[in-house]
Each structure stands twice: as structure tokens, then as C-alpha cells.
From Swiss-Prot:
Multifunctional sorting protein that controls the endoplasmic reticulum (ER)-mitochondria communication, including the apposition of mitochondria with the ER and ER homeostasis. In addition, in response to apoptotic inducer, translocates BIB to mitochondria, which initiates a sequence of events including the formation of mitochondrial truncated BID, the release of cytochrome c, the activation of caspase-3 thereby causing cell death. May also be involved in ion channel trafficking, directing acidic cluster-containing ion channels to distinct subcellular compartments. The keyword Endoplasmic reticulum applies. It is found in: Endoplasmic reticulum; Mitochondrion. The modification Phosphoserine is found at residues 390, 416, 453, 691, 694. Residues 687-720, 727-737 have a biased composition (Low complexity). Belongs to the PACS family. The keyword Phosphoprotein applies. Its main location: endoplasmic reticulum. One of its GO terms (biological process) is apoptotic process. This is Phosphofurin acidic cluster sorting protein 2.
């Protein structure tokens, strides 16, 4: 059935990096399935295994097991010896090839990769295996986008509890190919005679007999059921039950396909036929036979298009494409061909936009496709004549999210965040401009995409697996990172998903600066991972530590947040020395609280990037028409990169979000997100809130809190249920939608204030530092928590500050342990300093929260907790400034 090696690697840790090449394959009869099932061949190549934590006490070795969801047959690798610590990073050379039934009319075509160990009883090995960690890949996505460039699959140690990322497997290639019918028919051998007589019980017994050679006892490895998200057993049985009539129909279709396959080509006939023979008559007879068989037993997939196609591709219905904008590629399509799709072309420069287009609210040609759907934000007509970031506008609004985001009409190319749909029919374009109902969206949305969305799966990297970096990113990186022996002094990462980044990248590229244009989370992850790997190669080739590489981050606050999460994730697995190998420079484009803070501690930075000319240039699209009158953009950026040599250590705080469960049987999931800036809170009432995976959203200008919240693109609902040492990095790059109007929120906020330095000296004799817990349980107009240090703050204790605006209840509510508010005041704003920990939840449990963390929105949050310090050794984000010098006014 399968060829499996039971080779144990040498026990010495040094031998772990010597891969043992192994090919494991299995061919199983899958013709006993329903007509909506296509036998396909899954080819998987693994190149590296990384175990981050100890999977079990006294664990000696593990095996890598591969199986299809719902199948009892498993392919296992050799045993991989683990060191005493349980953590290992070893190269692999494993190739798995297994035949599986691909179901077209239901979900569940998932490839499961597991880490297992042999079962033990009283220190004695028994038959069977126990699953320690598992991860899954949707084969439907693999068929749409075969992975030839490699990907990383996270293995979680548990699914019933909060998933914990325990290991990673690096996949070199993964593809799904059709199998020729005649091959599987010949392999079936004598079993073909009894195919028509299969019953449900015979199929079950046949499965258990082969399973006996693998796991010895049917159903003994109950631990694997915890990781199987398949159908109930009765449903699985009904799927494989077929009638003899259907089998006869399939058999005759095979005969037709077989006759077509052995049809002699015209070239051979021309070279071998005798002139006296009448070949056309024979061809007519064959065609008549084909037509007769097709008429008696018609296929549900229509007529055959080409004779040289695979037999499996014609009699079966086609899979509905996930993303219609991409070309329908076969299993052998290379990733590079995807870059030719329209959505992955480099966005046009705003300078190329005609003046007529700019006058219409600054819309670029792609805005009609991108802004109202991907972000759910209104067009410029819904915000007539309101200036961006003007002091009057900020002072006149008391929004739940007080920061103004860039105008919706200027957010372009957001369809490149997730591989998009590029339907260009007039009817579709017309429907996208309005708010469609939830039922229409659910009906128009592919079922597999809904089932595999981040909100449904709660899997760490589910959404990032659907994204592929553009080839342009790698080309730009290869042009900058020339050799392993020498690192560049600086690299500029620009967010080109909006018009500000597109304009800046065009200006910088004309001056041949080291620019990398990123317009999706996959682009950012690819760029940052490549930089880290090049630094690692440099360290491997040189004994001296590298000079810190300056990485300029040009974008809004949410773009810096994406870089921060990658920084925390990558360096949490590195030694503390790595904290000095990179320095970051903040080039603000749009709303940026961190840039405003840097301007408060460095007057030269403030003059460069916080003056009115810079803000107008990147907040008003019309300002680019007079770009020759604006300050020299390139000069400011080059002076900042060259002169900013002082590393300002920005403290990293931790946000733990607890999401609501998707079903009553499912438990809530937790996600850890690092942040350095501001966290803002909104609330969503259940009467109007849509499901977490819905795109239906009301315009942000509605001004009613009870309306459906504007939802960002699916990639913007980032973060994964991972521990603080390895947060997710799938944060979206598009600006999240504006919060709804300043409505009232019934919240309960518990916070702990840390002792001040003076108090600590006084209480130095006490073992436990004094920590005071306070509770706010009232109606809020707004709630904002900032981790940015106070201006001029030295190395103080890690604390946060909270700004709240509360509303009186009966004009006698008590705000903190203070006297009652004046009766003529309805609301009051107060800033609370020195908070070390904070927990916020809605007073009514059915209400869900919307949390904006460093500009990235997270929805469907039951409650969240903020801590002033990130829990791993990566506690600071190094940002370059000119020096700690305030402006003199």
C-alpha cells in the first residue's frame, strides 16, 4: 500500500541537520466514491521542521504524518530524534505522494499534516500513534494556486482549547494533479469485477482491513479525532455509498474516454494509411459510437472540448474558482504566472491621473472597484467639503475612533490585499456601488471561501496562505540585496496600496533610492523575511556582527503596525543580539500617532515630517499638481536616513483579544497583538451586527452606532491565536474604515495602576509592589488607551495612559473616587496615567466590541486585555531619530 521508512536519525544533535531523502507514496482505490468525486494525486515536498516548544515531557522522537481529512489511511515519515529540550530545527527531504478523492460539491478537501509519536503503555511501546500537533491545508486552494515557491504551515498543539503554535513545517512544493482513469483501473486489478456490488458495510470493512496494517486497531488512535474537522460518521458513510446504476454510467464514460484516448492522430494516419483505404468511413463509425454512448448516458459536464485533455477533466463538473480575476491555471502553473493578472500590476502613479479625474473627488480609475467594497467606506460625495486632518474637523467630532483616516476616495488599489475578484461587467460594477443585503452577499460568495475565511477557521495563517507576494517585490529586493557578504545601509519599504505611497514610490524611484513597493500583507511578509534571512546569511559568513540596517517604513500607522508584528514574530525566535541588527525610520503618510510623538521629542523630525507642507502634500491629492512648489521630498527623506543615528527605544505593549465563539460548541479564541501606539474602542449591538465573515457594511457616515460596522478587507481582520512569542503577521495594509459616530457605549473597564518611582522607594522594603485596582462601569462616549510615553519621560516604569469621555447617568454618577460632577455638565473627559494592565468588556454580554489597534480594526471581540509590556524578550521597537531635543516655542 505504501512505502514507509522507519529510520531513526542519529541521536547526536549535530546530525539533525542532515536530511534523509525519502519518497513516500500510496495508491488507493477511490473509484468507490460518489460521482461528484474526482481522484487526484497530491504531491507534497517538505524541506524543514521547526519545533518551538516542548510537545511532551520526555519526548524522544516524532514522526511526520500526512493524511486527507476523513480518510483513515496515513502516510508517516521516519522517526525524527528530538534533543532533550524538545525544540529542534532540522532540514527535511521528504516527498509524499498520495491519491485522494477530491469532492466537488462539498467542503473538506483538506490535507492534514501532523506531528505524532508512538503510543506507550507503562514505558512500553504499543500499536498506534498519538497526535501532538496538527495543521491543515485546503486542497481546493492548492488547485487554484499551486505552491511552487514554498510556504510555511503552522502546527497547533490543540484545537479544542485555545490553539497554540507549537511547530512549523516548511513546504517546498505542493500540488494536486489529475490521475488518468486507465492507470487507476489497471491498478485496481481484480477488484474491478466486484465494484458494482460494493455496499456500505463492505466499504467500511475494506477500509479497516487496510488500516490494520497502519494503526493496528481500528479507531484506537482517538487523539487524531480531535484534529479532524470532518463530517459526522453517518454523513461520511453516505458520501461513499453509490448505486450500481451510477457505476455503470461511470464505466461507460470511461470506455468513451478510453476510445478517444487511443484514437490515432491524423499525422500517423497520413504517414501509414494505404491510398485505397477509406479512413473517413471508419472515423464516422467511431464518431457515431461516441454520440450513441453519450446520448444513452449523458455526462453532466457537457461535450468534450479537446481530445488531449485529461480524462478526469471532462466528465466531472468544474470547481468554481475562488478568485475570478485570476486565470484558471492548472496544477503545474508557476506562481510567476499569477503576477500577470490585472490586480497584481503595479498601481499607476497619481501623477498619471488626468486632471478631470482628480477634480471628481480625487478618484483614480480603480476606485470604483476598490474603495466601496474592500473597505466599506463611502465615496467623497458622502463627506462633502470636509477638509482632511483639519483642527476644526477633529475638534468638532467626538467619534468612537477620534483619528480621521484618509478620505475614502483616495484609498486605491485595495483589491490587491487579498487575491481579488476583477469582474468588470457593468451589472456587477453597478451593484458594487450600493450596499447589498447579507443574503445576496452570502449567495454570491463562494462557499469554500466562506468556510476558509479567517473568522471561520480561527487558524493562525489561514488568510496569509491565500496571498502570494508579487514578483516585483522579489525583483526589487534582489536589486538591493546584492550579496551575502555585504548588507545595504538602508531599505525603504513603501505601502503602495494607497495613493500616497504610489506617489512617494514614483518620486523615490526616479532618484534610484532602494525602494521596495508593497501593497499586500504577503508583500510585506516576503520583504521582511527576505531581509532577515539576508542578515542571517551575513552572520553565518562573518564573525563580526553586522552594522544595523536602517529600514524606512513609509505609510500610515497601520502599515507600521504590520512591520511591528513581523519584527516581534521574527525576532522572538532569535537571540537578543538580533535586537541591534535593525533600526526603523518612520516616514508618515496620513494619520500617524507615532510620528506625532516622535515630533514631540525631536524637533528636527518635527520640522521634516510634521509641518503643514508635508501634511498637505500627503493628505490632499490636489496638492500633487503643484509638486514643484512643495518641499523637496527626496531631500527630506535622504537627510533623515543619513542623519538619524540615535535609536529611540519605543516600548511594545501587548493586546490580548478574546473573540466570540462561532457556534455554541466552540470555545472562544484568543489572539495576542503587539502595539506601540493607540488602542481605540467601539461597540456593536447584536440586533444589527452581521456575522464576522460578512462583508455587508453600512457607510461610516451613517452616524448611528447601532448600524452595521464598516468592515475592512478580510486581510485587515488580522492577528492569529498565537502566544506572545509568535504573533500573527497577516495584518492588512489598507486603512481600516472610519468608526461610526460618537455614540454611547456601556462598558466596564478594570485597570491596575502601577506604583510611581517615588512610591517604590518608599515601599522598597515591601516584597510586593503596591498595585491599585480601579473599575469604571458607566456609559462612555469614547475610550482610548495609549502606550506612547509622555513627552520628556525618561526610563520610567512600563505604563499606559487612558483617555475617557463619560456621560452622566441622572447627572449624579460618580466618576472615580471623586465628588459628583456638576449638574450642568453632561460629559467629562479625563486622562488616567500609570496604568499597567487594563481589561475592557461590554456591560451587556451580547454586545461585541470593535477594537482599533494601531490603525488596524478587529471585530467580534468579547473583551480584551492590555498589558504595558510585551511578554517576550522583544520589548522595544528601535526607531531612529536625530536626537532627543524638543522644539523651542
Amino acid at each position: 500500500m505504501a512505502e514507509r521508512g522507519r529510520l531513526g536519525l542519529p541521536g547526536a544533535p549535530g546530525a539533525l541537520n542532515t536530511p534523509v531523502p525519502m519518497n513516500l507514496f500510496a495508491t488507493w482505490e477511490v473509484d468507490g466514491s460518489s460521482p461528484s468525486c474526482v481522484p487526484r494525486l497530491c504531491s507534497l515536498t517538505l524541506k524543514k521542521l521547526v519545533v518551538f516548544k516542548e510537545l511532551e515531557k520526555e519526548l524522544i522522537s516524532v514522526v511526520i504524518a500526512v493524511k486527507m481529512q476523513g480518510s483513515k489511511r496515513i502516510l508517516r515519515s521516519h522517526e525524527i530524534v528530538l534533543p532533550p529540550s524538545g525544540q529542534v530545527e532540522t532540514d527535511l527531504a521528504l516527498t509524499f505522494s498520495l491519491q485522494y478523492p477530491h469532492f466537488l460539491k462539498r467542503e473538506g478537501n483538506k490535507l492534514q499534516i501532523m506531528l505524532q509519536r508512538r503510543k506507550r503503555y507503562k514505558n512500553r511501546t504499543i500499536l498506534g500513534y498519538k497526535t501532538l500537533a496538527a495543521g491543515s491545508i485546503s486542497m481546493a486552494e492548492v488547485m487554484q494556486h499551486p505552491s511552487e515557491g514554498g510556504q510555511v504551515l503552522s502546527l497547533c498543539s490543540s484545537i479544542k482549547e485555545a490553539p497554540v503554535k507549537a511547530a512549523e513545517i516548511w513546504i517546498a512544493s505542493l500540488s494536486s494533479q489529475p490521475i488518468d482513469h486507465e492507470d487507476s483501473t489497471m491498478q485496481a486489478g481484480p477488484k474491478a469485477k466486484s465494484t458494482d456490488n460494493y455496499s456500505e458495510e463492505e466499504y467500511e470493512s475494506f477500509s479497516s482491513e487496510q488500516e490494520a496494517s497502519d494503526d493496528a486497531v481500528q479507531g484506537q488512535d482517538l487523539d487524531e479525532d480531535d484534529f479532524d474537522v470532518g463530517k459526522p460518521k453517518k454523513q461520511r458513510r453516505s458520501i461513499v455509498r453509490t448505486t450500481s446504476m451510477t457505476r455503470q454510467q461511470n464505466f461507460k464514460q470511461k470506455v468513451v474516454a478510453l476510445l478517444r484516448r487511443f484514437k490515432v492522430s491524423d499525422e500517423v494516419l497520413d504517414s501509414e494509411q494505404d491510398p485505397a483505404e477509406h479512413i473517413p468511413e471508419a472515423e464516422e463509425d467511431l464518431d457515431l459510437l461516441y454520440d450513441t454512448l453519450d446520448m444513452e448516458h449523458p455526462s453532466d459536464s457537457g461535450p468534450d472540448m479537446e481530445d488531449d485533455d485529461s480524462v478526469l477533466s471532462t466528465p466531472k463538473p468544474k470547481l468554481r474558482p475562488y478568485f475570478e480575476g485570476l486565470s484558471h491555471s492548472s496544477s503545474q502553473t508557476e506562481i510567476g504566472s499569477i503576477h500577470s493578472a490585472r490586480s497584481h500590476k503595479e498601481p499607476p502613479s497619481p501623477a498619471d491621473v488626468p486632471e478631470k479625474t482628480r477634480s471628481l473627488g480625487g478618484r483614480q480609475p480603480s476606485d470604483s472597484v476598490s474603495d466601496t467594497v474592500a473597505l466599506g467606506v463611502p465615496g467623497p460625495r458622502e463627506h462633502p467639503g470636509q477638509p482632511e486632518d483639519s483642527p476644526e474637523a477633529e475638534a468638532s467630532t467626538l467619534d468612537v475612533f477620534t483619528e480621521r483616516l484618509p478620505p475614502s476616495g483616495r484609498i486605491t488599489k485595495t483589491e490587491s490585499l487579498v487575491i481579488p475578484s476583477t469582474r468588470s461587467e457593468g451589472k456587477q460594477a453597478g451593484r458594487r456601488g450600493r450596499s447589498t443585503s447579507l443574503k445576496e452577499r452570502q449567495a454570491a460568495r463562494p462557499q469554500n471561501e466562506r468556510a476558509n475565511s479567517l473568522d471561520n477557521e480561527r487558524c493562525p495563517d489561514a488568510r496569509s496562505q491565500l496571498q502570494i507576494p508579487r514578483k516585483t517585490v522579489y525583483d526589487q529586493l534582489n536589486h538591493i540585496l546584492i550579496s551575502d557578504d555585504q548588507l545595504p545601509e538602508n531599505i525603504i519599504l513603501v505601502n503602495t496600496s494607497d495613493w500616497q505611497g504610489q506617489f512617494l514610490s514614483d518620486v523615490l524611484q526616479r532618484h534610484t533610492l532602494p525602494v521596495v513597493c508593497t501593497c499586500s500583507p504577503a508583500d510585506v511578509q516576503a520583504a521582511f523575511s527576505t531581509i532577515v534571512s539576508r542578515i542571517q546569511r551575513y552572520c553565518n559568513c562573518n564573525s563580526q556582527p553586522p552594522t544595523p540596517v536602517k529600514i524606512a517604513v513609509a505609510g500610515a500607522q497601520h502599515y507600521l503596525s504590520a512591520i511591528l508584528r513581523l519584527f516581534v514574530e521574527q525576532l522572538s525566535h532569535k537571540t537578543p543580539d538580533w535586537l541591534g541588527y535593525m533600526r526603523f525610520l518612520v516616514i508618515p503618510l496620513g494619520s500617524h500617532p507615532v510620528a506625532r510623538y516622535l515630533g514631540s521629542v525631536d524637533y528636527r523630525y518635527n520640522n521634516f515630517f510634521q509641518d503643514l507642507a508635508w501634511r498637505d502634500l500627503f493628505n490632499k491629492l490636489e496638492a500633487q499638481s503643484a509638486v514643484q512648489d512643495t518641499p523637496d521630498i527626496v531631500s527630506r527623506i535622504t537627510q533623515y536616513i543619513a542623519g538619524a543615528n540615535c535609536a529611540h527605544q519605543l516600548p511594545i505593549a501587548e493586546a490580548m483579544l478574546t473573540y466570540k465563539q462561532k457556534s455554541p460548541d466552540e470555545e472562544s479564541s484568543q489572539k495576542f497583538i503587539p502595539f506601540v501606539g493607540v488602542v481605540k474602542v467601539g461597540i456593536v449591538e447584536p440586533s444589527s451586527a452581521t456575522s464576522g465573515d460578512s462583508d455587508d457594511a453600512a457607510p461610516s457616515g451613517s452616524g448611528t452606532l447601532s448600524s452595521t460596522p464598516p468592515s475592512a478587507s478580510p486581510a485587515a481582520k488580522e492577528a492569529s491565536p498565537t502566544p506572545p512569542s509568535s504573533p500573527s503577521v497577516s495584518g492588512g495594509l489598507s486603512s481600516p474604515s472610519q468608526g461610526v459616530g460618537a455614540e454611547l457605549m456601556g462598558l466596564q473597564v478594570d485597570y491596575w495602576t502601577a506604583a510611581q518611582p517615588a512610591d517604590r522607594k518608599r515601599d522598597a522594603e515591601k516584597k510586593d509592589l503596591p498595585v491599585t485596582k480601579n473599575t469604571l462601569k458607566c456609559t462612555f462616549r469614547s475610550l482610548q488607551v495609549s502606550r506612547l510615553p509622555s513627552s520628556g519621560e525618561a526610563a520610567a516604569t512600563p505604563t499606559m495612559s487612558m483617555t475617557v469621555v463619560t456621560k452622566e447617568k441622572n447627572k449624579k454618577v460618580m466618576f472615580l473616587p471623586k465628588k459628583a460632577k456638576d449638574k450642568d455638565v453632561e460629559s467629562k473627559s479625563q486622562c488616567i496615567e500609570g496604568i499597567s494592565r487594563l481589561i475592557c468588556t461590554a456591560r451587556q454580554q451580547q454586545n461585541m466590541l470593535r477594537v482599533l489597534i494601531d490603525g488596524v480594526e478587529c471585530s467580534d471581540v468579547k473583551f480584551f486585555q492590555l498589558a504595558a509590556q510585551w511578554s517576550s524578550h522583544v520589548k522595544h521597537f528601535p526607531i531612529c531619530i536625530f536626537g532627543h531635543s524638543k522644539a523651542t516655542f
